[in-house]
């Protein structure tokens, strides 16, 4: 069953976390870069990257870090995109979600939103990748693809990459159209900006990513990482932690792209300490056998002058 919740509901559920950030004090503001940061022009599944260069797809406020790269901005950007898609909540088992019979019912293809997904690709991906010109319903040549084949244009990793890019991660995130690229980069230590943790031994924080294998790769566990191959996966951005509410009691909230063809919020069960798996790594979530928590290394918890 799908639910729609109000913005105020999410606000109150995240207020306690925001207050903790305020009590912890504010990080000093980084100096604004005089020029945009250089990032790899391409990043590959084996961990190698292309040459560094300026990416003119990325706004100056992000590439020059008008604010330090921080957790608050990542969660806020993810929640902004969620509201744009109508604030859907996807708490049912993905195996029980039938595909819409009418392509017009797919949020990713409706006016205003298919273009937004194009922005996720354009900004989030490295500039020389073919995918930068994709949208929610067209390929790089502008040809509308059949809705039945939209799995070939899956945009959930593009959404994650977009949020990190716009928040000012610059060269500290392995942007990719595939979640496995940054899961493996974090697990292998090839990315200095992201570390991978066993879900049974690390408590997710706001702005971290929690990840799971999909389909034939649902059996991937933390002990198998990094893999020597790419694999289908999904990651969501932790938008709220330490929640005690329906439907699970102890829970956290994640925001992910391409969930039911939209940006959706999902509640994830935790234990009383906020972890998503027990000490052996067994997920508390019967829907998702989480394989990793990706800790993103931010400059700050929040904007120095955010007012919170």
Residue spans for each PLM region:
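...with weaker cross-activation on analogous glycine-rich loops/strands in unrelated enzymes
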Residues: 172-260
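Low-complexity, Gly/Ser/Thr/Pro-rich intrinsically disordered linker/tail segments
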Residues: 253, 258-308
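C-terminal motif of bacterial Sec signal peptides marking the signal peptidase cleavage site
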Residues: 22-25
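Secretory-pathway/luminal and periplasmic proteins that interact with or process carbohydrate-rich
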Residues: 84-90, 168-172, 217-219, 262
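Short, solvent-exposed loop/turn and secondary-structure capping segments
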Residues: 90-93, 174-176, 222-223, 265-267
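Bacterial signal peptide processing site
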Residues: 27-29
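N-terminal capping segments
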Residues: 36-167, 305-308
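Bacterial N-terminal signal peptides that target proteins for export
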Residues: 2-15
